Each structure stands twice: as structure tokens, then as C-alpha cells.
Amino acid sequence: MPTDIEIADAAKMQPITEIAQKLGLSSDDIEQYGHYKAKINLPVKEVEGKKHKLILVTGINPTSAGEGKSTVLVGLGDALNQLGHQTTIAMREPSMGPVFGIKGGATGGGYSQVVPMEDINLHFTGDMHALTSANNTLAALIDNYIMRDNVLGLDPRRIIWKRVEDVNDRVLRNVVTGLGGIMQGVPRETGFDITAASEMMAILCLSESLHNLKKRIGRIVVGYTYEKKPVTVDQLGFTGAITLLLKDAIKPNLVQTLDHTPAIIHGGPFANIAHGCNSVLATQIALKTSDYTVTECGFGADLGAEKFLDIKRPVLGETPNAVVIVATARALKLNGGADKDELTKEDIPALEKGMANLRRHVENMQKYNLPIVVAINHFNSDTEAEIKTIQDACAEMGVKAIEVDAWAKGGQGTQDLAKEVVKLADEELEFHELYKNSDSIEDKLSAIATKIYGAKRVVLSKKAKRQIKTFNEQGWNDLPVCIAKTQYSFTDDQTKLGAPTDFDFHIRDLVPKLGAGFIVALSGTMMTMPGLAKHPAAENMDIDDNGQIAGLF
């Protein structure tokens, strides 16, 4: 079997104008970035007669290598089109942090990929750079404001706006700026986040138009005065300049799968330290122009799916017609106590124990009253006994578990799943909310921790309690909450795998993201700037004298 990059390099792509035509878009509706990439001009008109079905692809708590959720997503989109259901996929764009870190490329794999793969995984159309520039320009303007007149009395000790980079770089988590004398600015402690975890990224992904983007940027709270009053970008007068830097980045990107299914890729927030969903605009365009839209959310359903349903769905104005939960035998064995170096070996006892993790995710999606199917992503090490164990356990839960081989067979290996998705999407179910925005911040945190994670209670640090008091006084208590949590466990401790219950869930810090429209709650030891592993994926990457890339998965 060739590598992902070898398969992608051999692909015969259609001109992007032909892909656009499948969505009813003319050459005037797109801005081409070469022959195979384009940005979609806004606004996009709705195509009459479309079914507008939305399929959400999520997963279980993964191994560090990921479980192929994007691969299944692409295979499902291709399979639906092969079966005659006009489909578009809507995905997040990769961050170079994970690309060069643990997971490598993030455009699917095998024969279920989005192309041009190397472009998408590296710089693509420049959205990540635009977001980084907008974020850091605002940071520079804030520091300059403090150094100059500082009319509002912005306290350097209480600035919460950080600089960002699109890399995993732990040494930048805590830094001191402004050293070197009076002309170098006001010295203060600060730090860097990764671009994918920034509020600027969340704002881009939740904005419904350029006008809405500008309003959201203006609402950003950058810090507090000496009197502890919040200061926004609007108050500083920087809203227009920052919006200007994102005038092209707000336009979703159009590419294609190996099977020429339209793929709209836009925005890339992580689901563990951000809200984990691609842009509202990308999903809206797919829904307006397609019978079926297949989209994804990051990591397991405890993170990405919860945030899609509680944060993105209200802005999008659409509820998923069906949910696909991607599971693998190897991740279930890991959650059942198997050694991480022995996951390719058959281990039915560990698999049976690990099924508690999948069961929790299924039950969580059932709490929202959504139709569910489990996709068992096939790996070569899987045995018939393992697949049967998963399917039998799912049957006891009342859900189908369908084996897919999107990696080796593309859409052809995903057609059984596609047929079940079409069937489920026709069911008429009433969506159940997990909480109401009018609930208190404490109650919203408790709803997620107890109903989704299985916790006994939420334990707030003294700092978090003070912050909630401040947020209540400011009238910010009606915002949804976005919990930053490890992707490996339902708890705030990444070593506690499976499906723990009756544990304390700790919140140490809260950050108001008024531009994005939610409050971030940091649990456990979660960092908003990741670090690199001992052997990052970058070690295996190379390019030869002819520009041929190797090692990009």
C-alpha cells in the first residue's frame, strides 16, 4: 500500500472551477488560488430543491495517533455521492502544530483524502497566517497603547490577550516582554497560545458575515483597568484595523477529495483547548448547496460534539440529522487497559472493558436525542472476533455498528455506512438541549461535567470562584461555556481512561471570550500552547531537489 503522500501525488484532480459548478457556483463566485484551490466569495445563495441534511462525525476518546475520523468523514462523503446523494464535506483546516508534532497531516488518509494534501497541511490559502497576524497586531497595539498615554488606565498586570504562533512551542508558554529600557515598552509577564486555540480563530469560525466578524472583534476583552473594569477592542479603537487583516480569511476554502467530492475547509480550532468545529460559514455554504453535508468536530464526542451542539449549533441554526461515532478496536483496547505498545494484538477482555467508553459516548449523544450509528474504522490488525465483539455490544445499546475501510477502499469501503446514514437522517427527532444559556455559569459547568463526563461534581479553584463573581457582575453569565479538557479521558486527568464515574472535576481558571461568545473554563493542567513530543513527526519529513515531499503521512 503506498503512503498517503504518494496516493495524493498520483491523484488526478479536477479544475476547481468544475468542483465549484457542483455547488452551483460560477467562476465569478470564487477566487482561485492556482488550479485546484479557491476561496468562496460571500454571500452564497441557497440552491433550491436541496435536502439540506447535516451529518456530524465524531468519535471516542482516542489514542495519541488519532482514530481516522477525518478519513471516515471523507470516505462517507465520497460514498454518499457514489450512491447518488449530492454531498459536500465541511472540515477544519490543519494547524502546523500537530502536522509537525504527533499526528502528522490532517486531510484524511489512504484513498479517503482531501487534495492537494501537501498544500492544505502546510500554508494552504494563508488563513492561519492571517489569524496569527491579526492576533499579534492587536497584541502590539495593546503594548503600544500602554506605553503611550494609556488613557483608559489599562493595567499591564491584568492584560489577558496573548500573542500566538501556529507551532507547538512550549518555551513560549510564559515570557516577559518589554525588557531593555524605557523605549522598549512596559515590562510585563505574558505568554503565547497556539493560533488554533485563540479567540481570533473562534471568532472567525463563529462569524456569519464580515459585518458580524467586525462586531465580534470589537467585543474582545483584552484586559482590565487598574479599577478592574474590562477593556474591549472597540474602546481602544482598533476594531477596523484588525478586521481588515481578516477580510480574505473569512472566505471559506474550496478543494476536493480524491473522488472529486467538493470539500469546504475553513477554520481549525482544537476541540480540547478550543471549541473544535470548522466555520459556521463553511457549513452554511455546504448546507445551502447540497443535499447532504458531512462535517466533523475534534477528538471525542465529550469534546467536539458537545461543543458543536452547545456552542456552534445555536449560531448555525441547524441541528445534525444524524451522528456518526467513529470507533477503533485499538482505542477501545487502550481504554480497556491494554498496553499502548500491544494494541495490534487481539485482546478481547480489554476490548470488552473498553466498550464502556464507547457506551458513554453513545449515551451522551442520546441525551441530545440524536440518531446515532457507530463506524468501526478498520485497521489491518483488527480480527473478526474483535469486530464482532464491538458490533454485539452496540446491538445491546440499540445502535448499529458498521465496519468501514475508507483508508484502503475510499468511498467503496464506506457505502454500508452511507446507506445507514441516509436512513437515519430521515428520522424526525426533537433536539434536547443539555443546558440553557440562562443557567448560571456553575450550573452549565456542572451539566457538562456530570451529564457528559460522568463526574460527581465540579470543584472550582478560589481563582475561578472570584472570576465567576466578576463575570456575573459584568453580565457575562448568559454565555455558553467551553471547557478545555484532555482528549484522552472523560476526567481532567489524562491517565484515567475508560469511563470513570463519581470523580471530582477541577476548574482552575476561566477566560471571557466575548468576541467568540463563550467563556473558556480551563480544567486540570490543560495548556493552550502544546509542546512537541520526543520524536515529532517532523523528524520523518523531507523534500528532494525536485520538490517531491516525503513523510507528510
Curated annotation (Swiss-Prot):
Top-level enzyme category: ligase
Annotated ATP binding lies at: 63-70
A single BP term in Gene Ontology: tetrahydrofolate interconversion
Sorted alphabetically, the keyword list is: ATP-binding, Ligase, Nucleotide-binding, One-carbon metabolism
EC number(s) reported in the record? 6.3.4.3
The domain of life for this entry's organism is Bacteria
Q: Which reaction is this enzyme known to catalyze?
A: (6S)-5,6,7,8-tetrahydrofolate + formate + ATP = (6R)-10-formyltetrahydrofolate + ADP + phosphate
Biological or metabolic pathway of the protein: One-carbon metabolism; tetrahydrofolate interconversion
Q: Which CDD domains match?
A: FTHFS
An example molecular function term from Gene Ontology annotations: formate-tetrahydrofolate ligase activity
What family, per the record? Belongs to the formate--tetrahydrofolate ligase family.
| Entries under NCBIfam families matching the protein | PRK13505.1
> What name has this protein been given in UniProt?
Formate--tetrahydrofolate ligase 2
Per the record, the gene is fhs2
